[in-house]
Amino acid sequence: MRCLIVCENLEMLNLSLAKTYKDYFKIGAAVTAKDLEGVHRDILLKHFNSLTPENAMKFENIHPEEQRYNFEEVARIKEFAIKNDMKLRGHTFVWHNQTPGWVFLDKNGEEASKELVIERLREHIKTLCERYKDVVYAWDVVNEAVEDKTEKLLRESNWRKIIGDDYIKIAFEIAREYAGDAKLFYNDYNNEMPYKLEKTYKVLKELLERGTPIDGIGIQAHWNIWDKNLVSNLKKAIEVYASLGLEIHITELDISVFEFEDKRTDLFEPTPEMLELQAKVYEDVFAVFREYKDVITSVTLWGISDRHTWKDNFPVKGRKDWPLLFDVNGKPKEALYRILRF
């Protein structure tokens, strides 16, 4: 039996995720420019056909000062994508985090007017859409706007404070003017959980009824191996969002070996039990993705290998995590074999 499993896994080393799922959905990875070389480059070329700049397109990185853009890292990612017949997901225009303070201040250092902030947002969106229209197939227009710590529907942010609740609608309308054929997405975390699903549905339904040009919703999918309700919650969320006529992207998938509340720091590598549970969760959620392939058109992993993941040091400083399909050496984990085998 062991020989059969080993031989089967060796055979699967020749398989490509992107090619295996070509009749289902795009397979993407979040990347930095450093990922375009070495073992990560090899993994990208073999397994992925969609790239998301992990941080390079976020407002504070690409537009740190009013009269200065920083296109260097995205240029490298774009060049790599075009050369290798890949597409980009643009991430993100409007977010309460990683937006430089100048966006919300006037020339005197006072709070900017609604009109000035909208004007700046328009210029920012126009510049990025026109620069990347040949390679971006979807934009995360607004990110994480739904409140999840109180009973309020919308999160407090400088965007909302200055522009008002219509800032989401305005952002999508501006993006629609300049984004060409690219699809426009609202992106959020935990939006498959019942408490946030209900709120998100209300927000999106109201926006759509008012003619807001939203094409789809991004389910970030920062999950862990211990959630027993994940599959049932995910199916319900997909059906609810699809009922609004929305396309669905899985935008930031990783599966932590720790519960969010788990503060342990004693592990220097994942246990065999953790890796088996992780493989099973990946297997289960990809089965759901395939089941709903009519509405799910892209699945993106938030990273390439466990060598580099945003889950390191979060939510516990100094702790390593192992949430992706390839280990710290870039070798396939059992989770990869499980989602190739169907």
Curated annotation (Swiss-Prot):
Q: What class of enzyme is it?
A: hydrolase
Q: How is the activity affected by temperature?
A: Optimum temperature is 70 degrees Celsius.
Gene3D superfamilies reported in the protein's UniProt record:
Glycosidases
Could you tell me which SMART domains the record lists for this protein?
Glyco_10
Activity profile over pH: Optimum pH is 5.5-6.0.
Task: Please verify whether the record's keywords include Cytoplasm.
Answer: yes
What region holds the GH10 domain? 11-342
The molecule here is called Endo-1,4-beta-xylanase A
List the source organism.
Answer: Caldicellulosiruptor saccharolyticus (Caldocellum saccharolyticum)
Taxonomic placement: Bacteria, Bacillati, Bacillota, Bacillota incertae sedis, Caldicellulosiruptorales
